[in-house]
Swiss-Prot record:
Name the record gives this protein: Mu-conotoxin CnIIIB
Record-listed Pyrrolidone carboxylic acid modification sites: Q1
Signal peptide stretch: none
Keywords from the UniProt entry: Disulfide bond, Ion channel impairing toxin, Neurotoxin, Pyrrolidone carboxylic acid, Secreted, Toxin, Voltage-gated sodium channel impairing toxin
Superkingdom per UniProt: Eukaryota
Annotated function: Mu-conotoxins block voltage-gated sodium channels (Nav). This synthetic toxin blocks slightly but irreversibly tetrodotoxin-resistant VGSCs.
Gene Ontology terms for molecular function: sodium channel regulator activity; toxin activity
GO cellular component, one term: extracellular region
The keyword Disulfide bond is assigned to this record: yes
Keyword Chaperone: no
Disulphide bridges, residue numbers: C3-C15, C4-C21, C10-C22
Misc. comment: Found in injectable (milked) (IV) venom.
Tissue expression as described in the entry: Expressed by the venom duct.
Amino acid sequence: QGCCGEPNLCFTRWCRNNARCCRQQ
């Protein structure tokens, strides 16, 4: 669980599921 905190992780498997979270950055 580092998607929200690290933009570099936004395209990893679990972050693709949480794309909303990454877009908020």
